[in-house]
Regions:
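FAD-binding core/adjacent interface of flavoenzyme oxidoreductases
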Residues: 1-3, 70-159
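Beta1-alpha1 glycine-rich phosphate/pyrophosphate-binding loop at the start
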Residues: 1-73, 78, 158-159, 165-179
């Protein structure tokens, strides 16, 4: 019987691990809560309207379609039981593993200030990028109808917190009047 490899997460790490096992005599099960791989480095372009969500999301099954020893399951892993070597999904399904790779990604931290989220959205998902895009477009729509230059400037002023790659790319792709 082939060894069962379970990979939690279909991001860069999870896909890299799955592909590295292509020639191995194992069965690979990749589990993710989304059925697509998100190319996160381009999310800023979704937020600014340069790309659509479909341009940065590739179906996981398509990405691994030529890999005969891999399957993709949609599910939310809620528990790992090392004693029985099983992962448990939110729907109660259990999957046995001989080896487990956890590549679940990351999320933004508001350091105990979750109320900041409404004013400082993170940019880690298609949904967040789309929300930012809608907020930017709404601000431009409101500003276009204003005759008072001070009010108009207030609606067209955005603050980008973070000087990592995402923050720099977002700032660099925003209209000059908006930054």
């Amino acid at each position: 019987m082939k060894k069962q490899i379970v990979i939690i997460g279909g991001g860069f790490g999870g896909l890299r691990a799955a592909r590295a096992l292509k020639a191995a005599s194992v069965d690979v099960t990749l589990i993710d809560r989304r059925n697509y791989h998100l190319f996160q480095p381009l999310l800023y372009q979704v937020a600014t309207g340069s790309l659509s969500a479909g341009d940065v999301a590739a179906p996981l099954r398509s990405v691994l379609s030529r890999q005969k020893n891999a399957r993709v399951l949609l599910g939310d892993v809620v528990d790992v039981d090392p004693a029985s070597r099983r992962v448990v999904l939110a729907d109660g399904a259990r999957f046995r593993y001989d080896a487990l790779i956890v590549a679940a990604g990351s999320q933004s931290s508001y350091y105990g200030h979750d109320d900041w989220r409404q004013w400082a959205p993170s940019l880690k998902s298609v949904e967040e990028a789309t929300t930012i895009r809608h907020k930017i477009l709404y601000a431009f729509e409101v500003a276009e109808r204003l005759s008072d230059p001070i009010q108009r400037r207030a609606w067209l002023t955005f603050a980008i917190v973070g000087a990592g790659a995402t923050g720099v790319e977002l700032a660099g792709s925003s209209p000059p009047a908006a930054v």
